[in-house]
Amino acid sequence: MQSPDGQETGRPAAILIAGPTASGKSALGLRIARAFGGTVINTDSMQVYADLRVLSARPTAEEEGLAPHRLYGSIDGAVNFSVGHFQRQAAALLSEMDAGTLPVFVGGTGLYFRSLDEGISDLPEVPDAIRQRIRAEADGQPTETLHAALALRDPESAQGLRPSDRMRVMRALEIHAATGRSIGSFHDARVPGPLAGKPLLKLFLTTEREALRQRIDARFVTMMEQGALDEVAALRERRLDPLLPVMRAHGVPGLTAYLDGTISREEAIQRGQGDTRRYAKRQFTWFRHQMGEDWRWTTPEAAWSQVEARLSAPAGR
């Protein structure tokens, strides 16, 4: 059922909590799960990795013990975990959950949230042998050179990509090598989301920008005190592909450079803080322009009142 302003008013099948990094999403999700018998489900592309508890700001072991948490820290850093992988895991988890359990999806990755409701393009899996061959050929080449190579093989994809966007250029090259088709040719075929058509409460947590920037900077310093450098040192020892998501997480490149001796510790911290602030800005922009009007922009304090109101409503009303 909807209110006169078009918002759902009945009890939701799931709660979706998004927002910029350091906005209080995890704390709100845990509070909801404890109060209403819910399970907190990770919806953040970095918090899936076992290697990054500290740098991804994953819930602590103590917090995870207060309510069920799923899809956190379950993936090895060597895996190129995609939105398709997330959607399949989330769908499987939802099918296994008891009927009375409230799913509480928490995170900052917009495409993950979109995959739950609107679905995603049905992109094919790229065999490891092809991915490794393409990346070996690309090693040491400027991204602009790779973009030019893509333009020769797949002009349609190249036209829609910035010549400096190495990750997406590489993805287009891999898809074309594996299928002989443009990556854009797969966009019309969609995999429906596991929450499509269900009543949902979608909350985007917002806060005053300067306060958020200060929290981001302070949190990165705290991460350093909690072992962020040890996490990066362990990743560095594994010599993983620098294009893997885990190697591009905020803080990893700068701290790797510090361990390599090319920048100072203070410069590494400043780089991590700056990268995270810019990411938060992109999160605001992306959700504002890419997600539907059914997302409620709210403060963490006001969000709790909205949750209480919706969860106290009888189902179907």
UniProtKB/Swiss-Prot annotation:
Keywords: ATP-binding, Magnesium, Nucleotide-binding, Transferase, tRNA processing. It is an enzyme of class 2 (transferase). Its EC number is 2.5.1.75. The keyword ATP-binding applies. The keyword Nucleotide-binding applies. InterPro entries: Dimethylallyltransferase, IPT, P-loop_NTPase. GO terms for biological process: tRNA modification. Residues 44-47 are annotated as: Interaction with substrate tRNA. GO terms for molecular function: ATP binding; tRNA dimethylallyltransferase activity. ATP binds at G19, P20, T21, A22, S23, G24, K25, S26. It comes from the Bacteria. Its cofactor is Mg(2+). It holds the Pfam family IPPT. It catalyses: adenosine(37) in tRNA + dimethylallyl diphosphate = N(6)-dimethylallyladenosine(37) in tRNA + diphosphate. Monomer. Belongs to the IPP transferase family. Catalyzes the transfer of a dimethylallyl group onto the adenine at position 37 in tRNAs that read codons beginning with uridine, leading to the formation of N6-(dimethylallyl)adenosine (i(6)A). This is tRNA dimethylallyltransferase. The gene is miaA.
